[in-house]
Amino acid sequence: MANKKLAFQDIILTLQGFWSKQGANLMQAYDNEVGAGTMSPYTFLRSNGPEPWGAAYVQPSRRPADGRYGENPNRLFQHHQFQVVLKPSPKNIQELYLQSLAALGIDALEHDIRFVEDNWENPSMGCAGIGWEVWIDGQECTQFTYFQQVGGIEVDSVTSEITYGLERIATVIQEVDSVYDLEWGNGVAYGDIFKEPEYEHSKFAFEESNQELLLKLFGEYEQEALDLLDKGLVHPAYDYILKSSHTFNLLDARGAVSVTERAGYMHRVRTMARKVAKTFIEERAKLGFPLLKDEALREKYLGKKGKYTKIVEGEEK
């Protein structure tokens, strides 16, 4: 462990510097409610298709059912993920991850770091992959995944995703038991910034949300997303899919949907997710997959017998 314990904001800056040197583009948090960094278009959309891609970004992640009124030391309505996606996956990705921990002052020789097999899936978004939870000193701090399917579509090129739970990483580094005792930066505590919002969002999610309004909004967001997809407007449509997903999560936290209804709502979100993923690939194919520079791969996907040639030629919809 380094002598000076990194503040929360310095952890972010350190990870940004590390992954930028590994070829990741430093993106900003997506400006829509999401439950995980995976749901940002910088991961969800870009993981499909054959184009190479690298991104790293902080993503505030809202999970209404996990709210605990600011009273639980490590369970939150909103937490922060540091998301890294590299496509195609580097062969030494696990070693790079361990190097990133070392950059944070977490020495593998001084800490108990374990990769625990945990094949990951997000059923509502049609995502799945093989992977591991990474436990540091007895608590899960990172999810490590090789994507196999995104939006219900088998990927062309395997994307490696590393999702750091920033609050948990920070409690290891700063050696505190409660996230609210973390130093965010410049002497300001995490609790000074986020404890009151945690209480208010929890009260809203569990007690005060308007169920009738949320049910209406889900249907309207869903219809808007489908209408936009029919017009080929992928990115606005995806925004409304994210709104639909978050609205469902609010309904679920409020106990407003039965077990049977829950499965139905998840199916509706998954249907939209599959359609937007497919439409995004078609959009990129028609543009000629501009980020794909490897000629052999261009031939494989866009050549005479290429996988996406019919889409480009307008023979497939």
From Swiss-Prot:
Keywords: Aminoacyl-tRNA synthetase, ATP-binding, Cytoplasm, Ligase, Nucleotide-binding, Protein biosynthesis. It comes from the Bacteria. GO terms for cellular component: cytosol. It catalyses: tRNA(Gly) + glycine + ATP = glycyl-tRNA(Gly) + AMP + diphosphate. One of its GO terms (biological process) is glycyl-tRNA aminoacylation. One of its GO terms (molecular function) is transferase activity. It is found in: Cytoplasm. This is Glycine--tRNA ligase alpha subunit. It comes from Lactococcus lactis subsp. cremoris (strain SK11).
